Amino acid sequence: MQKIRRDDEIIVIAGKDKGKRGKVLKVLADDRLVVGGLNLVKRHTKPNPMSGVQGGIVEKEAPLHASNVAIFNSETNKADRVGFKVEDGKKIRVFKSTQKAVDA
């Protein structure tokens, strides 16, 4: 079970976007996350009249490593760590500071 999943609210704890918050759009296999509005890079694209792509300089989100982000606990308004608990035979994610379920 992954500690950070899609649609989790995270906060960046290291790097150029340190302190910024965002929502996880995609989780990649090599411990990387694509976060909405963070770690923006500029990509130069060629125009392609066949598919209707105009071309030019496009800003898009690049993946961040999972070690540079922490899950955001809206109850405490701080970054938090994730632990696991077994309730009713199911493994659930909990915040380490409050022991409350992440998905609740």
Swiss-Prot record:
InterPro entries with a match to the protein in the record: KOW, Rib_uL2_dom2, Ribosomal_uL24, Ribosomal_uL24_CS, Ribosomal_uL24_KOW, Translation_prot_SH3-like_sf
Entry-linked Gene3D superfamilies: 2.30.30.30
A GO term from the CC aspect: ribonucleoprotein complex
Record keywords, A-Z: Ribonucleoprotein, Ribosomal protein, RNA-binding, rRNA-binding
Entry similarity comment: Belongs to the universal ribosomal protein uL24 family.
PANTHER family in the cross-refs: MITOCHONDRIAL RIBOSOMAL PROTEIN L24
Function: One of two assembly initiator proteins, it binds directly to the 5'-end of the 23S rRNA, where it nucleates assembly of the 50S subunit. One of the proteins that surrounds the polypeptide exit tunnel on the outside of the subunit.
Protein name in the entry: Large ribosomal subunit protein uL24
